[in-house]
Regions:
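Extramembrane terminal tails and long inter-domain/linker segments of multi-pass membrane proteins
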Residues: 1-12, 17, 112, 144-170, ...
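Membrane-interface interhelical loops and short amphipathic "cap" helices
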Residues: 23-47, 98-120, 191-213, 240, ...
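Hydrophobic alpha-helical transmembrane segments
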Residues: 50-57, 121-134, 217, 290-301, ...
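Long, contiguous internal "core" modules enriched in hydrophobic/ aromatic residues
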Residues: 5, 9-18, 73, 111, ...
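N-terminal signal-anchor module of multipass membrane proteins
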Residues: 1-58, 400, 404
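Transmembrane-helix bundle segments that line or gate the permeation/cavity pathway
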Residues: 27-34, 51-158, 176-185
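Central hydrophobic cores of alpha-helical transmembrane segments
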Residues: 318-328
Length: 415
């Protein structure tokens, strides 16, 4: 067991170092190493950022509810839920720095913040969220540190009995949960508003987007918690904790059902409107990116059916498989926020042609004349480069590094 933990730590460290090297290369060359342009200025970085924020929010929502509603069957997973939220929040913060592209931009957001920008508020909320999730992990680990004589900023409990430490841990975990729950909802609401406040993008400009983000956050965050809980608990505790696993499965399934309901409402209204904009949007969704959109819809549906089934949730493999495809679908969902919104120029005019009035997309500057060979375009097909994937290893590697280190040093699951 200790050997596998060390291997996990080494792999996570290697990912982080590779991502850091890629980031240094990006700082030297600029965002030109990506496939982003003036038209498609939010790429894989922003999609991954929204993904990590969602997983972080979902993990903390579950952790907070465990203590606020005193769910006994889920209490063994409280530390895992809080730690996954902390790790993903740190990864999301790193992804913001990566997307800013240069040291000057990073410094400007702290030295000269523009408070009318949702991104500034997202940075503020994420920073507070990192502190809250760390405190949640800290207080939940205190009893274990007291029992095993481990150090985790716990000098203040040396002269306290184990009973006093356990009482303190439970009290403060509940207090933090009371604050962290609205923060978890707030962090993803602000992230959703970054998209929803862009009036020129038909695909984003909807009041449904923030609650839909929350639903997917609960589904993806719950999926990561479920994977970690099953893997760290091992076979010997599976039957004992099956009731807790099934509760998480139902939470994930309900969240997916809510997401699919919101998606259906958006598609029905778009089809009903029948405007040029909505018809163009549906054409992009089911035509140009039909395969990706099918993955986004089919994978969570399969997971939802799996998690609602008592028979299938009796299998460790089925639950892990369902959780993995939920995480995959969530990342695809974040990517599909961008592709339909940025593929075509948002400026258009009605022009008179041979067949009557037609909608003409006004070409805009690409900013990539050397690479593309032409300065203006009305459509842009974005594809993340190898360099983007390499740089993205930094935030994702950081998430795994935190999880691996804490798993090696501290008892996340009491056997």
């Amino acid at each position: 067991m200790a050997r596998s933990k060390r291997i996990f730590l080494i792999v996570a460290l290697a990912m982080t170092c590779a991502g850091f090297a890629g980031w240094i290369y990006q700082l030297m060359r600029g965002l030109v190493i990506t496939d982003m342009s003036n038209m498609f200025n939010w790429g894989f970085y922003i999609a991954a950022f929204a993904f990590l924020v969602g997983v972080a929010a979902g993990g903390m929502i579950i952790s907070s509810c465990i203590y606020l509603f005193d769910v006994e069957k889920l209490k063994p997973f409280g530390k895992i839920a809080s730690l996954s939220a902390f790790a993903c929040a740190c990864g999301a913060g790193a992804m913001v720095l990566v997307d800013l592209g240069s040291i000057q931009n990073i410094l400007n957001i702290f030295i000269h913040p523009n408070f009318s920008s949702p991104l500034v508020w997202d940075v503020i909320v994420i920073s507070c969220y990192i502190v809250l999730t760390f405190l949640s992990v800290y207080f939940q680990l205190l009893p274990d540190c007291k029992k095993d004589g481990l150090w985790f900023f716990n000098g203040g409990i040396r002269n306290q009995s184990l009973e006093e430490v356990e009482k303190k841990s439970h009290t403060w975990s509940k207090r933090i949960g009371l604050v962290a729950l609205p923060f978890a909802i707030g962090i993803h609401t602000v992230t959703a508003l970054i998209f929803a406040t862009q009036n020129s993008h038909e695909w984003w400009h909807t009041a449904i987007l923030p609650p839909d983000f929350i639903a997917m956050a609960v589904a993806s965050g719950g999926s990561l918690v479920l994977i970690l809980a099953i893997v760290l608990s091992g076979r010997e505790l599976f039957n004992e904790r099956l009731g807790g696993y099934r509760i998480i499965c139902r939470i994930i399934a309900v969240a997916i059902a809510v997401h699919l309901f919101f998606t259906a409402m958006e598609l029905i209204l778009a089809a009903w409107a029948g405007s040029v904009e909505t018809q163009s949007l549906l054409g992009v969704l089911f035509g140009d990116y039909g395969v990706l959109y099918a993955i986004e819809l089919i994978l969570p549906t399969v997971a939802m059916v799996t998690f609602f089934s008592k028979k299938w949730t009796a299998s460790k493999g089925q639950m892990v498989f369902g959780s993995v495809i939920v995480l995959m679908a969530t990342l695809v969902h974040r990517l599909m926020l961008l592709y339909p919104a940025f593929k075509n120029a948002t400026v258009s005019f009605d022009v008179l042609g041979a067949n009557g009035m037609a909608d003409w997309l006004y070409p805009v500057s690409t900013g990539r004349v050397i690479e593309m060979g032409f300065p203006f375009a009305s459509t842009y097909a974005y594809m993340p480069t190898v360099a983007e994937y390499l740089v993205s290893l930094l935030p994702f590697g950081l998430v795994l590094l935190i999880l691996a280190f804490m798993n090696l040093k501290y008892p996340l699951v009491r056997r």
